[in-house]
């Protein structure tokens, strides 16, 4: 797969995960950065793919990947936004 992908889930009881997913997509949309939203709740293989790319068997959404390169999770994303290094974080620069 190529391009920027945000792994998310449409089925979660966690308000924190919902809020984090929403913030990531809101920021990307606001900066007009194109990405594909990958819903891991539709297929266990997608969840496994996300965890393999993240290098963490317990990783939870949102996770951000560009091509086959893992960018990071929500905390790293927010840190990049705050430090104005989002392009580098997303491996777009």
From Swiss-Prot:
Q: Which residues form the Glutaredoxin domain?
A: 2-93
Residues bearing PTM N-acetylserine:
2
Quote the subcellular location field of this record: Cytoplasm, Cytosol; Cell projection, Ruffle membrane; Nucleus
Q: Which residues form the signal peptide?
A: none
Please provide the record's keywords in A-Z order. Acetylation, Cell membrane, Cell projection, Cytoplasm, Glycoprotein, Membrane, Nucleus
**Entry's InterPro entries?**
Glut_rich_SH3-bd, SH3BGR, Thioredoxin-like_sf
Annotated tissue distribution = Expressed in heart, liver, lung, kidney, spleen, thymus, ovarian follicles, skeletal muscle, brain, lymph node and mammary epithelial and stromal cells (at protein level).
Q: Name one GO cellular component term.
A: cytosol
Q: Which residues are glycosylated?
A: 9
User: What is the protein's known function?
Assistant: Could act as a modulator of glutaredoxin biological activity. May play a role in cytoskeleton organization.
Q: Which family does it belong to?
A: Belongs to the SH3BGR family.
Name the chain's protein: SH3 domain-binding glutamic acid-rich-like protein 3
Which species is this record about?
A: Rattus norvegicus
